[in-house]
């Protein structure tokens, strides 16, 4: 009998000309939490998709309890006791918790009787592992933390002995993260093993027993938690591409002048009692008021889907206001005025980059001038200056480390991280008055994240105001001067930098405080 529950040996995987996994080795022991750490694009999710049967390896072997395992699909993985909770849940909103958990399981002969048995089993699993759920609750009414418990119970219901969690804390409040970690410890105490995929150092050091680091599709380091240090893990993740000791990402220390006091001058952007509807004409933002001063970074925290996108679009004239007013430099922002704003010192990095910020069939050079194509030096107002456009594109490709054959390459051939770099290069191509950035570092590796942070802080020093919308509290705490917290379309509070605290913000993110009280406190 092998000492390992799982062994992955020499795993290779290519997508066309791109090598995603290069001779990767990984082991998991019974009853342990293995942290799988790496930056964006390191190969973490690809490796786990191979293990779960969603991808087929080009070479290599998988052994479960010392025996070769042929995993050609998720059904084979489940047969071998391997379950996976994806970063984006696969659920049916119109079903109850119980119906989602048993969905896909055979219910023969007497479905009602079997549902009663399933209910009992789900309740037993929930109690054993600290995964409190109401089996009869409609899924659509539940928070992301409870939805995640449903996905974990779905795997445990199918007798998973090895549970893969892909970036499980991304959409959780700090309190929900603590609850998840408690459940994971209960699981390993009862013999379940866990592979915990993350790019966050703090998490692996808090909950994992061993840590394996991937970089550029290779396994470069495995350490026991007791011997792991922040600097060793960061160095393994990025190699020599980042000065660890001087890094904003690593040290968490922001350098630069303190923010201006907003009350000393007219704020640049003001939102007054704004209400905005979503695409179904349902309320997305309600009675939202705040101001951003010149040279200030205001963060917007909240679990995804609480109105962040609608607010950003309303502020920039992309989406109509149901009521209220937005002003920029004292002038009202009106619907349809977006192009004028973008041509006059405003930049927007949207959440849905492929839908709202990028043309996959156009060249990299085209994408780098979107919204700026009628302005010098790209144009004389009538004709495009392609020599200047291509020369400028080459400069931006180098400055922002966009991995592409050149300015004429088609955008569809870029990776997600490189598409994000194109959006960032376009945003910072000119002096800015206002930046509205929604998850600006998504899909980027650590050196690129560091580069973005430095760019934002450098522009802040010149007077640029920033609305930074992010689900990453570490990012918000590092960069922001003040922090607004959004819950179900309402601003629950606005905190000064001296009062940033993960648990206070987490409480606001879960709606624990009344909107009126917190808003007044935030502005006071």
Each language-model region and where it sits:
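Glycine-rich phosphate-binding loops of nucleotide-dependent enzymes
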Residues: 2-524
């Amino acid at each position: 009998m092998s000492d390992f529950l799982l062994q992955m040996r020499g795993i290779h995987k290519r997508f066309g000309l791109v090598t995603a996994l290069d001779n990767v080795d990984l082991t998991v022991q019974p009853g342990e939490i293995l942290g799988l750490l790496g930056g964006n694009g390191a190969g973490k999710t690809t490796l786990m998709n191979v293990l779960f049967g969603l991808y087929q390896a080009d070479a290599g072997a998988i052994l479960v309890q010392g025996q070769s395992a042929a995993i050609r699909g998720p059904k084979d993985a489940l047969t071998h006791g391997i379950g996976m909770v994806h970063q984006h849940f696969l659920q049916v909103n119109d079903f109850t918790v119980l119906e989602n958990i048993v969905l896909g399981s055979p219910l023969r002969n007497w479905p009602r009787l079997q549902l009663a048995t399933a209910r009992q089993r789900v309740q037993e699993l929930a109690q054993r592992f600290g995964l409190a759920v109401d089996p009869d609750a409609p899924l659509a009414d539940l928070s992301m933390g409870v939805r995640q418990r449903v996905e974990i119970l779905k795997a445990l219901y199918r007798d998973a002995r090895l549970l893969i969690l892909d970036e499980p804390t991304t959409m959780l409040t700090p309190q929900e993260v603590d609850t998840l970690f408690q459940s994971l410890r209960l699981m390993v105490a009862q013999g379940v093993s866990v592979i915990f995929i993350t790019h966050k150092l703090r998490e692996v050091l808090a909950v994992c027993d061993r840590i394996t680091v991937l970089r550029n599709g290779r396994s470069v380091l495995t350490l026991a938690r007791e011997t792991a240090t922040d600097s060793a893990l960061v160095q393994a993740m990025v190699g020599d591409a980042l000065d660890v000791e001087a890094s904003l990402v690593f040290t968490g220390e922001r350098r630069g002048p303190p923010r201006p006091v907003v009350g000393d001058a007219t704020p640049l952007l003001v939102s007054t009692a704004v209400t905005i509807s979503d695409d179904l004409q349902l309320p997305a933002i309600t009675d939202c008021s705040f101001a951003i001063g010149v040279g200030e970074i205001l963060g917007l925290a909240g679990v995804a889907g609480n109105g962040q996108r609608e607010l950003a679009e309303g502020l920039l004239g992309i989406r109509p206001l149901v009521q209220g007013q937005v002003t920029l430099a004292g002038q009202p922002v009106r619907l349809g005025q977006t192009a004028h704003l973008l041509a006059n010192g405003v930049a927007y990095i949207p959440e849905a980059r492929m839908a709202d910020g990028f043309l996959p069939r156009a060249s990299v050079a085209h994408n780098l001038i979107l919204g700026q194509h009628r302005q010098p030096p790209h144009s004389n107002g009538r004709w495009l200056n392609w020599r200047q456009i291509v020369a400028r594109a080459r400069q931006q490709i180098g400055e922002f480390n966009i991995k592409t054959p050149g300015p004429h390459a088609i955008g569809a051939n870029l990776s997600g991280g490189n598409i994000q770099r194109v959006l960032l290069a376009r945003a910072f191509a000119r002096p800015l008055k206002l930046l509205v950035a929604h998850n600006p570092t998504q899909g980027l590796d650590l050196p690129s994240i560091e580069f973005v942070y430095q760019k934002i802080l450098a522009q802040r020093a010149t007077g640029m105001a920033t609305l930074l919308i992010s689900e990453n509290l570490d990012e918000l705490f590092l960069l922001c001067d003040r922090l607004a917290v959004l819950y179900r379309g309402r601003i629950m509070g606005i905190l000064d930098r001296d009062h940033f605290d993960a648990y206070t913000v987490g409480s606001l993110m879960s709606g624990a405080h009344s909107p009126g009280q917190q808003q007044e406190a935030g502005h006071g």
